[in-house]
Amino acid sequence: MKEVIDTVGRRKTSVARVFMSPGKGRVIINKLPAEEYFRDEVKRQQALRPLALTEKMEDFDIKVNVHGGGVSGQTGAVSLAIARALTEFDESARAVLKKEKLLTRDPRMVERKKFGRKKARKRFQFSKR
């Protein structure tokens, strides 16, 4: 078994690279503790959900490099990358994570703006007369 597992997770325009190794449960995101990087408790729990579900919160040290997008996209990217790393370490975790749909890349992206319109689908105001 490899000492350090590195995986990639993507969501919207965010890309997260996770380096996971056996340790004491430290999570470092872009050289900051997870509590500082994701100040919002809900977003932090969302990002670390794969660890909570598999009850491996204290078993691994995780270093994350994440860039692009906003907080929501980065949260999803980190979550997917951690879930993928957990399955490489422990194949039995795959069933739990798959059931919770944490191993599925969310394909939803921002729809492009079309010409002749205000936004992707919104039209300019129509005047009959």
Swiss-Prot record:
UniProt-recorded name of the protein:
Small ribosomal subunit protein uS9
Ordered alphabetically, the record's keywords are: Ribonucleoprotein, Ribosomal protein
PROSITE patterns, A to Z? RIBOSOMAL_S9
What Gene Ontology molecular-function terms does this entry list?
A: RNA binding; structural constituent of ribosome
Which gene name does the record give? Answer: rpsI
Q: Which family does it belong to?
A: Belongs to the universal ribosomal protein uS9 family.
Q: List GO BP terms, alphabetically.
A: translation
Q: Which GO terms describe its cellular component?
A: cytoplasm; small ribosomal subunit
Tagged with keyword Ribosomal protein: yes
- The species this protein was found in: Chlorobium phaeobacteroides (strain DSM 266 / SMG 266 / 2430)
